A protein has these predicted regions:
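Surface-exposed, low-complexity/disordered segments
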Residues: 1-231
Length: 231
């Protein structure tokens, strides 16, 4: 703990072992570092998770996990990044707005052209997509699912009609997105709102696919997370 800076830093010498019974995964998380800034209430943790599917005892348990994973996926940042890559934001239930600040007053501006406003560029040589939003902050609204009651209980000012997350980008820095939803450099964006609240409990591997609908193989990658408490 750094008293002058009011900063807590945690390092791990061994991978963290996480058992997620709700989603049916064991996660070996190699934590690089965890930092919490008490002045800003901003948390940053970076690391690399290795997911292993738990062995189900019966078909009912398998179906329960599949249903829970689908709920965790829909509206998640993984879902969002895949939707950006495939230019399917509207079809997936996402809406994007720019957040503009003037004299400490925030204004949300609806967008007509999501991809033009994010300066969407597809690099066919690497099968990646680059985005660099015109505004530093974007609001991501997921309209197909309402927020958890647990989230609403701790965020009284949040809307109960949709899930709202805020993503802050570094100026003049592109974010690269792969087909499986992996994006980099992950340290270059900060996440607030609903996605920050979900965190590891709802984290899915990059090769996740809905077994009832998916037909293609998705590449696996690692991740780091830059997250802040809900706004």
């Amino acid at each position: 703990y750094y008293r002058r800076a009011k900063r807590l830093k945690i390092l791990a010498t061994e991978p963290l072992e996480i058992v997620n019974d709700a989603l049916g995964y064991t996660i070996k998380y190699e934590l690089d570092s965890f930092i919490h800034e008490y002045n800003t209430q901003l948390s940053l943790y970076t690391g690399f998770p290795l997911f292993r599917e738990m062995q189900s005892n019966n078909m009912a348990e398998t179906e329960k996990w599949d249903a829970a994973r689908k709920v965790a996926y829909e509206g998640s940042i993984l879902h969002f990044m895949r939707s950006v890559f495939h230019k399917k934001l509207n079809e997936a239930g996402f809406e994007i707005q720019f957040i503009v600040k003037n004299n400490n007053i925030e204004t949300a501006i609806p967008l007509k052209d999501y991809y033009g406003s994010m300066r969407f560029y597809r690099d066919d040589s690497s099968n990646t997509v680059e985005i660099m939003p015109i505004q530093k902050e974007i609001a991501v609204i997921y309209k197909n699912e309402t927020p958890s009651t647990l989230f609403l209980d701790s965020n009284r000012d949040a809307s109960a009609a949709f899930q709202l997350s805020v993503v802050s980008f570094l100026p003049n820095e592109t974010l690269d997105i792969e087909q499986n939803g992996f994006y980099f450099e992950q340290k270059d964006i900060t996440i607030n709102g609903y996605w920050a609240w979900e965190k590891i409990a709802d984290m899915l591997p990059y090769d996740y696919k809905d077994r009832s609908t998916a037909t293609e193989t998705i590449e696996v990658n690692t991740t780091s997370v830059n997250a802040a408490p809900p706004v």
